[in-house]
Amino acid sequence: NSASVTVGYSDAVTGARQIRILGLSGVYTQMLDENRPAMRGIAAPFELSYVPGQWLESIQVSKGLSTVVNGVESITGQINTEYRKPTDEKPLFVNLSAMNDTKTDVNIASSLQMGDSWSTVILGHISGNLKTFDHNHDSFRDDPQMLQFNFANRWLYYSPTGIQLRFGIRALQDSRSDRRTPSSQYGWV
């Protein structure tokens, strides 16, 4: 029953989205990164925005208490994300998008085969909402200002004898500002 999985806004100031499974907020849902625990603590409300959609190969959603095998955080369920693999057939993927509300996304994915044993995938993502508006003139922006840089490099070594070695690095930088307009910070309306 997928009706028990919903996406909602958890924070009006930052605009963070949160998954609700079985009616409970995202802090009771465990986010997995290729079956490894991912976002925890203060990053939990932003866990969905830290996973660029163009990087994904698949998503698996599990609901209920039977999912506590992978950790105690998964009271209501788990969301597992699988990323593009170093052995991906597409050598280069570029995606640019700009919405009419000034939100911009840039995604790059490149898979490289380096001989018979080594392969790598380089993933890049930049998203931002740099210019925001206050259409109803209530001294609060309609969306928060934000800028996010996300980079990952994953490697795979596969020997003819069957030995595999997988490793990688991932970096994330996210900056957000509140929804107050500059004039409301000083009491001007």
Residue map of PLM features:
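N-terminal periplasmic accessory domains that precede
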Residues: 1, 17-20, 46-52, 61, ...
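Short acidic/polar hinge/loop motifs at secondary-structure boundaries
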Residues: 36-63, 151
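Structural signature of outer-membrane beta-barrel domains
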Residues: 26, 38, 84, 99-101, ...
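Predominantly transmembrane beta-strands of Gram-negative outer membrane beta-barrel pores used
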Residues: 30, 58-62, 78-84, 91-100, ...
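Short beta-strands and strand-coil junctions in structured, solvent-facing domains, enriched
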Residues: 6, 28, 38-39, 65-69, ...
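Outer-membrane beta-barrel domain signature
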Residues: 8, 46, 66-70, 95-98, ...
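Extracytoplasmic beta-strand/coil segments of soluble accessory domains associated
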Residues: 2-37, 57
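Flexible loop and strand-edge segments within Gram-negative outer membrane beta-barrel domains
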Residues: 129-150, 156-189
